[in-house]
Amino acid sequence: MKDQLEIRKTLVLSTGHVTKRVAEILDEYRSQPEGFDLYWQNIEYGWLFRRTRLDNQDLEYMGRKIPRCLRNCLDLAAANGCDYLIFDCDGPQVDQLPFYNW
């Protein structure tokens, strides 16, 4: 049987695309708080988000809970067909999103 590689697309962004307050919250929880349908984990210099649990219905519902700066980043990842979103302190700044210099 031929091995098939499973390859997933990831968007990497600067941590500066979320506000300092959102960054503090992400660091505080370190992973998904109970009752919050978005999975992430802290990595050495940022956060890794998995958007595989999010479909359009969940995004509509969750849009009321997720801070706008984070929602914009998740939307950009989804629009580009990405399964994962990594925020890295050395990640690129993109013109499509606001940048918060904290």
Model-derived features: where do they sit?
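An N-terminal amphipathic alpha-helical segment
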Residues: 19-53
